[in-house]
Amino acid sequence: MIQEQTMLDVADNSGARSVMCIKVLGGSHRRYAAIGDIIKITVKEAIPRGKVKKGDVLKAVVVRTKKGVRRPDGSVIRFDGNACVILNNNTEQPIGTRIFGPVTRELRSEKFMKIISLAPEVL
């Protein structure tokens, strides 16, 4: 459950280390984002010579949450932290060329197959 002002780790090599959610996209008064949802973020901490810099406002897809995701068989997959993958504002494709850490099968939609293929582990 990601809401406005939530700090997230970045699970790709775009150059950002820490980002903050500034808006949950998809609905006029939507409060929370879960795994697979797109959010608007601002970069709070970045490494030198990265593809993004501090202060950039971009889109991102949530790939891991502490709240987790419930499967139809009743199992729940939770993670130790909240993480996202930064997307291009126009094409909504990942900016980075590598994904760090596991991602869930819920991302397996037409939009995010690139993230699934780059991820080292799909749960």
Swiss-Prot record:
Biological processes per GO annotation: translation
Record keyword Ribosomal protein present: yes
Keywords: Ribonucleoprotein, Ribosomal protein, RNA-binding, rRNA-binding
Molecular function as annotated in GO: large ribosomal subunit rRNA binding; structural constituent of ribosome
Pfam families (UniProt xref): Ribosomal_L14
GO annotation, cellular component aspect: cytosolic large ribosomal subunit
Protein's UniProt keywords contain Ribosomal protein: yes
Family statement drawn from the similarity comment of this UniProt entry: Belongs to the universal ribosomal protein uL14 family.
Function: Binds to 23S rRNA. Forms part of two intersubunit bridges in the 70S ribosome.
Subunit record text: Part of the 50S ribosomal subunit. Forms a cluster with proteins L3 and L19. In the 70S ribosome, L14 and L19 interact and together make contacts with the 16S rRNA in bridges B5 and B8.
Protein name per the record: Large ribosomal subunit protein uL14
Originating organism: Actinobacillus succinogenes (strain ATCC 55618 / DSM 22257 / CCUG 43843 / 130Z)
This protein's encoding gene: rplN
